[in-house]
């Protein structure tokens, strides 16, 4: 072919197949040309691609390492603090089958957070404080205050030159003259309680955890290492051959202006792997929060009201009685943000038995953190507790303000042999469309539970089996002889009977009929079917929804040895929980 129609593939084929003539020099030339062509077309591009790929991978890895390294705090602020979340130490149970890997005698769960106070003059924090103050002003409509922090203020942007007055004036000028302001004391309380939301978390901080033995003469110390996550939190599960009595936490990072690193020591809490445990919700279960009320009231309950105003009558007595009488261990699990830990710890320690507190880590909008919650968030920490104590029986206590019933039902299904009872506190305005009917609806759902969940107990207590009467004695075949007096007595009785024959005597009352166990659905008529007003005057959608939810939980728990009860008076739940514990121990 001519030069314009040069076929590279045919040339390559000819070169690889050998010279067409018998000249040996021609063969060497073709082999040399073929080597050059192969080197240029195949080897060099592959080598270049390989080098480029490795170079880019190296650049990316170097960049990533630098980016991660830049996240590490080279020097922590002098006011950095360690917040320790008390958890527990427990005994590792021996696997009877020997299938699991050998473990040490004790396991300790360590939880803490590293942070330092936020800059009060930063734009974000000034905006947040001003927004909270306006939101808490009496008389301000909720629509007047949009509880949203602008996206560019979600993260602390540092110390900016914007004056605080310019921001506060933009927020409060509309209501400056129309609404009353917060008192000085309330403002001080707000500033104190909101500090957890203003603080700065310290991520990627190396931490050293030392577990110290109870017996100082042993001299054993176990050290463990970890790094805080993106929220500044640390979770370590440490196994030891000895029972630790103290936990020493050290930040392995230089501190600004200090030669020694920050180090604090906390007590270790041992919890037996056996016995009874109680997992309790916090909001509207052991403290007045008002999740079912308006947002402003709930916000004031959390950030303004006195801590002792949170106490729900009867609940502290219930918990303390179980702790003192039945040696029950307590665990507190809530959707409250972890930034409120210090305040909740103060409240629980003053009114309830001590125990670890598990709160939720939130991020993003401050008001969304406070106002929103989901019972599903509590399932995982509850499951972790049950896994750590597989031989322990538990009581779950929640409230009707959230979906605690569904969360606890799911937990009982996942751990069928560990849940003794579920108690749901009836909150105000949560079970009926008419607030005054909450108690009535609660009694109705308890009746449904009684009929459905305890049919055997009801049958034994209300329906008694009758014994067959003994057979009559066999009459004697010998005819008895009567005296004259007996004969006269018989004659007189017959005459009296004839005289009174006209008088009808009322028949004796019929014996009580034995009623079969009736399904609770027999008594449940949804208000949606109440078209003619036969069962009520209005449609109570909340009540119908609660009956449906309760029936669904009862059906799921039909094969479980788990009792369910709604309560408004903690004295009734105290009595029932003591009975349930005694039944379990007596078996």
UniProtKB/Swiss-Prot annotation:
SS bonds (residue pairs): none
PTM statement from Swiss-Prot or TrEMBL: N-glycosylated.
Dependence of activity on temperature: Optimum temperature is 30 degrees Celsius.
Compositional bias segments (type: Low complexity): 9-22, 163-174
Known regulation of activity: Inhibited by N-ethylmaleimide.
Native organism: Saccharomyces cerevisiae (strain ATCC 204508 / S288c)
Listed name of the protein: Phosphatidate phosphatase APP1
Cellular component, GO, one term: actin cortical patch
């Amino acid at each position: 072919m001519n030069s314009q129609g040069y076929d590279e593939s045919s040339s390559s084929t000819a070169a690889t197949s050998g010279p067409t003539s018998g000249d040996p020099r021609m063969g060497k030339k073709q082999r040399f040309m073929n080597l050059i062509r192969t080197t240029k077309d195949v080897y060099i591009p592959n080598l270049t691609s390989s080098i480029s790929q490795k170079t880019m991978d190296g650049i990316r890895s170097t960049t990533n390492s630098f980016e991660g390294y830049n996240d590490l705090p080279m020097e922590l602020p002098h006011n950095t603090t360690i917040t320790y979340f008390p958890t527990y130490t427990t005994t590792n149970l021996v696997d009877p089958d020997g299938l699991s890997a050998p473990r040490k005698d004790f396991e300790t769960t360590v939880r803490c957070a590293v942070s330092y106070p936020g800059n009060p003059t930063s734009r974000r924090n000034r905006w947040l404080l001003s927004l909270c103050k306006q939101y808490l002003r009496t008389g301000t409509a909720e629509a007047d205050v949009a509880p949203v922090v602008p996206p560019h203020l979600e993260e602390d942007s540092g110390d900016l030159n914007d004056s605080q007055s310019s921001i506060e004036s933009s927020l409060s000028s509309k209501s400056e003259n129309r609404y009353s302001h917060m008192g000085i004391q309330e403002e001080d309380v707000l500033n104190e309680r909101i500090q957890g939301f203003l603080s700065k978390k310290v991520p990627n901080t190396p931490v050293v955890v030392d577990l110290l033995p109870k017996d100082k003469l042993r001299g054993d110390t176990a050290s463990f290492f970890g790094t805080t996550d993106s929220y500044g939190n640390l979770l370590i599960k440490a196994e030891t051959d000895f029972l630790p009595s103290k936990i020493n936490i050290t930040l392995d990072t230089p501190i600004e202006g200090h030669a020694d690193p920050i180090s604090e020591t906390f007590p270790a809490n041992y919890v037996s792997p056996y016995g009874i445990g109680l997992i309790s919700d916090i909001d509207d279960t052991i403290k007045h929060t008002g999740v079912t009320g308006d947002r402003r009231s709930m916000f004031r309950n959390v950030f303004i009201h006195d801590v002792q105003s949170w106490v729900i009558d009867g609940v502290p007595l219930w918990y303390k009685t179980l702790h003192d009488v039945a040696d029950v261990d307590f665990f507190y699990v809530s959707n409250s943000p972890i930034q409120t830990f210090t305040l909740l710890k103060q409240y629980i320690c003053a009114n309830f038995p001590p125990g670890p507190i598990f709160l939720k880590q939130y991020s993003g909008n401050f008001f969304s953190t406070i106002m929103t919650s989901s019972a599903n968030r509590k399932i995982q920490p509850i499951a972790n507790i049950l896994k750590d104590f597989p031989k322990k029986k538990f009581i779950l206590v929640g409230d009707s303000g959230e979906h605690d019933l569904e969360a606890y039902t799911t937990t009982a299904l996942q751990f069928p042999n560990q849940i003794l009872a579920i108690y749901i506190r009836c909150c105000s305005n949560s079970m009926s469309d008419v607030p005054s009917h909450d108690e009535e609806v609660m009694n109705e759902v308890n009746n449904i539970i009684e009929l459905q969940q305890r049919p055997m107990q009801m049958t034994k207590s209300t329906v008694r089996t009758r014994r067959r009467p003994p057979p009559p004695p066999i009459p004697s075949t010998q005819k008895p002889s009567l005296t004259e007096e007996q004969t006269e007595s018989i004659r007189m009785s017959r005459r009296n009977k004839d005289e009174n024959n006209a008088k009808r005597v009322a028949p004796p009352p019929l014996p009580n009929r034995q009623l079969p166990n009736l399904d609770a659905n027999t008594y449940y008529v949804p208000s949606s079917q109440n078209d003619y007003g036969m069962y009520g005057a209005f449609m109570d959608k909340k009540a119908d929804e609660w009956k449906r939810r309760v029936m669904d939980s009862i059906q799921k728990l039909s094969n479980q040895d788990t009792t369910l009860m709604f309560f408004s008076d903690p004295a009734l739940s105290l009595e029932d929980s003591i009975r349930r514990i005694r039944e379990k121990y007596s078996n």
